[in-house]
Swiss-Prot record:
Assembly notes: Interacts with snoRNA U3. Interacts with MPP10. Component of the ribosomal small subunit (SSU) processome composed of at least 40 protein subunits and snoRNA U3.
Family of this protein: Belongs to the UTP14 family.
Lineage: Eukaryota, Fungi, Dikarya, Ascomycota, Saccharomycotina
Protein name as catalogued: U3 small nucleolar RNA-associated protein 14
Alphabetized UniProt keyword annotations: ATP-binding, Nucleotide-binding, Nucleus, Phosphoprotein, Ribonucleoprotein, Ribosome biogenesis, rRNA processing
A single MF term (Gene Ontology): ATP binding
Gene behind the chain: UTP14
UniProt organism field: Saccharomyces cerevisiae (strain ATCC 204508 / S288c)
Length: 899
């Protein structure tokens, strides 16, 4: 076993040395793997080299030349051919590789000897090495590029051949070693495996380098032109290549050179690409920056629209296009055949010359003085101003679409024509045309759709609708009426047959009756009482007309025909709807006259309504005198005035009354003019006559009527003035006097007593103080005793209650402490400090956006909005909506003003 291990180690070390030698040879480029076959070829050549150029120029038809050329061609080798045979494999360090290779070489050598050796190569094709070296020097000087192109090819071919031979020798040596061992891979250490791997990787690297394309660093010699590039020797610079500076030296423009300098930079390799997640993040950031810059352009417009009080859409003004109409010409030259024909007609008629009008204007103003010219200019300016105003007014009125407005304007125009009463041929012609249209269309009849609907739905009962329909029928009659021509005979006579005003009214009434009969049988005017009233009015009008005609004829007027009739058996007295029947005689008439006079005297009212006279009348002794009149009625008279006082005493009492009670000092004049009710009372018994009873009834009726006419203020005043003595304050002198003095001193009261009587029992100040105290106690903090009775004590029979020392008192917080109230030092004020939580949502915690401070906001709230406090323009501005749009208008998106 020891011998076997030593042998394997020696073989492995030998294989390592072979592998190292092969690697060094490949790295150094030394391919000395020439075989015996090569030696034999070298021996036959005798130090000569085949002239390949000559062979390429020679005859290619001979078979020998073909064989020689084929021997120098680069062919693709199969794996079997590279290993030496199809059946046997050349394995690294195999013991069979060398024997196989020796057998193949011997066989090839025998075949070549049988064929007669190198018969395909002529002696003329051979050339000495010295000649080859001389040719290389010459070609390098004349045309270095061609030699450099050809020599690498030859070198590459030689290297390929040498590599093949070296690989074959290695395989043979390896095969010999493998033959000595039965299993070469059984006892291979790890170090040996690492060495083998290194050799294999080095081989692979060399193969990739050999297969890489060769780069030519040389160019053709000679001067550079449009067909030939400059040579490497002629190029400037250390690297021998054309640089950017060489190209920029030709340019004279400095600005271009400065811009080109930006292209200069050190070429560097690309960095390792970032992960996709980070790349997407960078892309999003870049996109956000671009979009932010684009959106920031609209910031000013958005802020302006937000701060604007009113926005009228569309914000973009519509583009106005000047469309050429059929009557306006855009150019002086005619564009169509029609324009050419029109120009031709104008030129033939001498109307197309604009200079002609200007000449006439110059001639008209040539003879004018400067003052006349200025006057004419002023008149023309005024005319143009008036025309402009009329045009503007006409455009404004034309836009009005109200039917009511059109109807009113039409009536006004017709009324003005009637008032003008100027008849001309044009008016007659217009009237004839309107009359013909009316007779043909019958527009102002009840045949129209509107009139039929009004009659069908019973709208004729409405006063306005009925009036409109009547006006329509009258308009139709006016349009159909003929124009009355005046004859010459009538003008000579001077007698114009006209009706009087009363007859015209009568005729109009008849026409209106006929019209109403056409309209229908319903309505207020067709009721019985309305018809009776119209009939009475008609009879009165007829009577008036008859009297006027009698006056015209010279007859007398009998105004009072009822005076001739005698009153036989009945005397009618108007007394609120009652009739009293008495025998018709002259005595009864006299009695009635006396009764009326007596009643008027009874109804006279005393003018003195002052409080002083009333008090004097109540306190002084009043005598009642009863008397009986001739008719048997007992009349009780109550004298309102007492005993007459002296003038001085009356004046003194008046002055004292004014000083004592100033409320009664300034009485209005109306109180003095009001009449006092009658103080006489008619006592009626069974024996009273009918006239007395009738007079009493008439007097009562008149009194009731007067009471109804009086207002509430007068009634209240009467009640105040007729107060009883029990409700009046009487002040008596405590030191006493006579009864007369005491009666006089009743009126001597003071103003304080009147106030005390007016506000008796009204202690307002005390009530206010009590209410304020109650409010303070309710809103103040309170202490509530929450101690429960019996809690913590003994109960039951024999238990004695103890005085409990500990009390549980809870303090309830009120609205505000009484010491911190705002009305603490204000005696006559109560300030409510309760907070209503329902009102908190209507209170603003901060000032709204447009306002800067609280004063501005409160000032805006104080400003009224209604039409009653502001002008029409201000009201419209205040209620104007913030966003206004026109119906049917296309709202396009905003156009960027910065483009």
């Amino acid at each position: 076993m020891a011998k076997k291990k030593s042998k394997s180690r020696s073989k492995s070390s030998r294989r390592v040395l072979d592998a190292l030698q092969l690697a060094e040879r490949e790295i150094n480029g030394e391919f000395d793997n020439s075989s015996d076959n090569d030696k034999r070829h070298d021996a036959r050549r005798n130090g000569t080299v085949v002239n390949l150029l000559k062979r390429s120029k020679g005859d290619t038809n001979s078979d020998e030349d073909d064989i020689d050329s084929e021997s120098f061609e680069d062919e693709e080798l199969n794996s079997d051919e590279a290993l030496g045979s199809d059946d046997d494999y050349d394995i690294l360090n195999s013991k069979f590789s060398q024997t196989i290779r020796d057998k193949k070489e011997n066989a090839n050598y025998q075949e070549e000897e049988d064929e007669g050796g190198y018969t395909s190569i002529d002696e003329e094709d051979l050339m000495p090495l010295s000649q080859v070296w001389d040719m290389d020097e010459k070609t390098a000087q004349s045309n270095g590029n061609d030699d450099e192109d050809a020599s690498p090819q030859l070198k590459l071919q030689d290297t390929d051949i040498s590599s093949e031979s070296s690989s074959s020798e290695e395989s043979e040596s390896e095969s010999e070693d493998d033959e000595e061992e039965e299993d070469p891979f059984d006892e291979i250490s790890e170090d040996e495996e690492d060495i083998e791997l290194n050799t294999i990787t080095s081989k692979l690297i060399d193969e990739t380098k050999s297969k890489a394309p060769k780069r030519l660093d040389t160019y053709g010699s000679g001067e550079a032109n449009e067909y030939v590039l400059p040579s490497a020797n002629a190029a400037s610079g250390a690297s021998g290549k054309l640089s950017l500076t060489d190209m920029m030296n030709v340019i004279d423009d400095r600005q271009v050179i400065e811009n080109a300098n930006l292209l200069k930079g050190k070429s560097s390799t690309y960095e390792v690409p970032l992960p996709q997640r980070i790349q997407q993040r960078h892309d999003r950031k870049a996109a956000y920056e671009i979009s932010r810059q684009e959106v920031s352009k609209w910031n000013d417009i958005v802020q302006q629209n937000r701060r604007a009080d009113h926005l009228i859409f569309p914000l973009n003004k519509p583009t106005e296009h000047n469309h050429a109409s059929a009557f306006t010409r855009t150019q002086d030259v005619p564009q169509t055949e029609l324009q050419e024909k029109v120009d031709q007609v104008l030129q033939e008629s001498n109307l197309a010359n604009p200079e002609k009008d200007s000449k006439f204007e110059e001639l008209s103003t040539a003879k004018m003085t400067p003052e006349e010219m200025r006057k004419r200019t002023t008149e023309m300016r005024l005319m143009r101003e008036l025309m402009f105003r009329e045009e503007r007014k006409a455009r404004r009125l034309k836009k009005i679409k109200s039917k009511t407005y059109r109807k009113i304007k039409k009536k006004e125009l017709m009324k003005n024509r009637e008032l003008a009463a100027v008849s001309s041929d044009e008016d007659n012609e217009d009237h004839d045309i309107a009359r013909a249209k009316e007779r043909m269309t019958l527009k102002h009849k009840t045949n129209s759709k509107w009139a039929k609907d009004m009659i069908k739905h019973g709208m004729t009962n409405d006063a306005e609708t009925r009036e409109e329909m009547e006006e329509m029928l009258r308009q139709g009659e006016r349009l159909k009426a003929k124009m009355l021509d005046r004859n010459s005979d009538d003008e000579e006579d001077g007698r114009v047959q006209t009706l009087s005003d009363v007859e015209n009214e009568e005729k109009e009434n008849i026409d209106s009756e006929a019209l109403k009969s056409k309209l229908g049988k319903t309505g207020v005017m067709n009721m019985a009482f309305m018809k009776n009233g119209e009939a009475r009015e008609r009879e009165a009008n007829k009577e008036t007309l008859r009297q006027l005609r009698a006056v015209e004829n010279g007859d007398d007027i009998k105004l009072f025909e009822s005076d001739e009739e005698e009153t036989n058996g009945e005397n009618i007295q108007i007394n609120k709807g009652r009739r009293i029947y008495t025998p018709g005689s002259l005595e009864s008439n006299k009695d009635m006259n006396e009764l009326n006079d007596h009643t008027r005297k009874e109804n006279k009212v005393d003018e003195s309504r002052s409080l002083e006279n009333r008090l004097r009348a109540k306190n002084s002794g009043q005598s009642k005198n009863a008397r009986t009149n001739a008719e048997g009625a007992i009349i009780v008279e109550e004298e309102s005035d007492g005993e007459p006082l002296q003038d001085g005493q009356n004046n003194q009492q008046d002055e004292e009354a004014k000083d004592v009670n100033p409320w009664l000092a300034n009485e209005s004049d109306e109180e003095h003019t009001v009449k006092k009710q009658s103080s006489k009372v008619n006592v009626i018994d069974k024996d009273s006559s009918k006239n007395v009873k009738a007079m009493n009834k008439m007097e009562k009726a008149e009194l009731k009527q007067k009471k109804k006419k009086k207002g509430k203020s007068n009634d209240d005043e009467d009640l105040l003035l007729t107060a009883d003595d029990s409700t009046r304050l009487k002040i008596v002198d405590p030191y006493g006097g006579s009864d007369d003095e005491q009666g006089d001193n009743v009126f001597m009261f003071k103003q304080q007593d009147v106030i005390a009587e007016a506000f008796a029992g009204d202690d307002v100040v005390a009530e206010f103080q009590e209410e304020k105290k109650r409010v303070i106690d309710d809103e103040d903090d309170k202490e509530v005793d929450t101690t429960l009775p019996g809690w913590g004590e003994w109960a039951g029979a024999g238990s004695k209650p103890k005085n409990k020392k500990r009390k549980f008192i809870k303090k309830v917080k009120g609205v505000v402490n009484k010491d911190k109230r705002r009305d603490k030092n204000l005696q006559n004020v109560i300030i409510n400090e309760k907070v209503n939580k329902k009102n908190l949502k209507y209170q603003s915690s901060a000032v709204p956006f447009p306002f800067e401070n609280r004063e501005q906001y409160e000032r805006s709230l104080r400003m009224p909005i209604g039409q009653e406090w502001t002008s029409r323009a201000s009201h419209q501005e205040l209620i104007k909506p913030r966003i206004m749009t026109k119906p049917g208008q296309v709202i396009d998106p905003l156009k960027a003003p910065f483009k």
